[in-house]
């Protein structure tokens, strides 16, 4: 089982849409000039050194939010794992476009600021198609279905 962030290509997976969402925003140092803002808008991102996910679906999602070409942004690095991007942010290398609940900023030098207008994504529980489940996995899936 895994948790997938929409949009997702489900051609290889079965899934259950979860009743939860997460929102996009910017991970930055607490002393960054944008850290005092409550929200980050598209204009705020112009010319900033950005660290972005290297997934094409993410780029498409953010292009729609920007109402502009994603390639016009000043992308200085890409990431597969947000933890690695958070290390770059902590070193002052840029600002990471990411989801809210992936990096714990409590007691750290980093903070998260949501995008405005708000950009939310759905979450799905996914598993390989035609999967034969163990008793424990089968029980887990039935319990998730029961709870949602």
Roles of regions detected by a PLM:
Residues 48-71, 133-137, 141:
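Secondary-structure junction motif
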Residues 11-17, 21-23, 83-130:
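Beta-alpha-beta core module
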Residues 31-41, 58, 117-119, 130-136:
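Short helix-loop capping/hinge motifs at secondary-structure junctions, enriched
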Residues 1-8, 29-30, 81, 97-102:
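Beta->alpha turn/N-cap motifs
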Residues 43, 126-148:
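Extended ligand-binding regions for polar small-molecule ligands
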Residues 52, 71-84:
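Short beta-strand-to-loop elements that line the ligand-binding cleft
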Residues 12-24, 28-50:
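Flexible hinge/capping segments at coil-to-helix
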Residues 3, 26-27, 50, 75, ...:
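Generic preference for hydrophobic
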